[in-house]
Each structure stands twice: as C-alpha cells, then as structure tokens.
Amino acid sequence: MSNKEQHIEKEEQLQEEKHEEQQKTEETEVEAVNGVDPLEEAILRVQELEAQLTEMVKKEQDFLLRSRAEMDNIRRRAEQDVEKAHKFGLEKFSKDILNTIDNLERALATPANLEDESIKSLFDGVELTLKELLATVSRFGVEAVGVVGETFNPEVHQAISMQPMEGFETNQITVVLQKGYLLNGRVIRPAMVMVAA
C-alpha cells in the first residue's frame, strides 16, 4: 500500500468515527428532547418494583397476622369447648339422678314409727345413702338451691304461687316444693317454691 492509500484510509476512518460520534450525540439529544434518559428510566423502574415489593410484603405480613389470630381463636374455642364438655358432660346424668335424690328425701319425710328398731335402722340406712349420694354429686359440681327464707331469684327459682305470709318479707321463699340444682353454676333444674307477697 502506498502512503496515499494509507492516508485516504485513515481519513475515511476518521470520518466514520466522527459520523458515529455525531450519531450518538444526535441520539442523546433526541432522547433528551423526548425526556427519556435510560438511567433515569431504570431508576424509576427499580423504584416502582421496590414499591410493589413493599406492598406485597405488607399484604403477606397482614395475611400472616390474620392467620395467626384465626389459629389462636380456633385453639381458644376448642379449649373452651373441651372445658365445657368436662364441666357439663354430666348434665344429663345429673338430671336423671335428681329423681333418685328426691325419692330418698320423700322416703325420709314420711311419718313412721321410729320406736321400731327395724324401721329405725331402715331410715338410718336411707339417710346415710342420701348423705353419700349428695356428697358424691357435690364433688362433681352439683349443688342444691332453694331454701326457705332465701330471697326469690327467677334465674334459679320457679314461683308456683305468691301468698302473703306472716314472718316473711315480700319476695322471700316461704315453702320449697321441690329443690332445684345447679351444675357448675348452670341451672339443671329450678327450685319450685312458694313466695311471700
């Protein structure tokens, strides 16, 4: 190659480089005119993705907290159900045994000739049986309600009648026709009573 050819080739290369630089400058100017800078665009996109990610994290944390609260509520309800089952599982049995208690009390209330030794020992046996039965049901949370002189409470007493009675204030129980019973504080049978008017 001759010097002339090399010189022409160098000039062409220089012109090409100038032309490329001019194009890049024009592209940058066009982008600047359009207001789109690739770096700014990338920064905006990253910020947008960060905001989306933050929102998703908040939603997931909220979901997690709600799930935990729901699990706690389910566990608490299950514990309460088990506790109620323990407390009141004997309710049907307790209601059924109340008739036996009533019958034993009626047997002891009947007039009898207690001078006869066999009748006296029979009454003593019934009395001991009743005491043992009452002690047993008491251990399981059954308690009697309805005592003469007590103030009438409609939650645990059922008034059969109201009559004026000397020696009693208004709303006091004058006669207990049938004892009532509670099982762990819950009424399983209200006491049937007469109340002073």
Curated annotation (Swiss-Prot):
InterPro entries: GrpE, GrpE_coiled_coil, GrpE_head. CDD domains: GrpE. Its main location: cytoplasm. One of its GO terms (biological process) is protein folding. It is found in: Cytoplasm. Residues 1-27 have a biased composition (Basic and acidic residues). Signal peptide: none annotated. Pfam families: GrpE. SUPFAM superfamilies: Coiled-coil domain of nucleotide exchange factor GrpE, Head domain of nucleotide exchange factor GrpE. Disulfide bonds: none annotated. Residues 1-34 are annotated as: Disordered. GO terms for molecular function: adenyl-nucleotide exchange factor activity; protein homodimerization activity; protein-folding chaperone binding; unfolded protein binding. Participates actively in the response to hyperosmotic and heat shock by preventing the aggregation of stress-denatured proteins, in association with DnaK and GrpE. It is the nucleotide exchange factor for DnaK and may function as a thermosensor. Unfolded proteins bind initially to DnaJ; upon interaction with the DnaJ-bound protein, DnaK hydrolyzes its bound ATP, resulting in the formation of a stable complex. GrpE releases ADP from DnaK; ATP binding to DnaK triggers the release of the substrate protein, thus completing the reaction cycle. NCBIfam families: PRK14140.1, PRK14150.1. Homodimer. This is Protein GrpE. The gene is grpE.
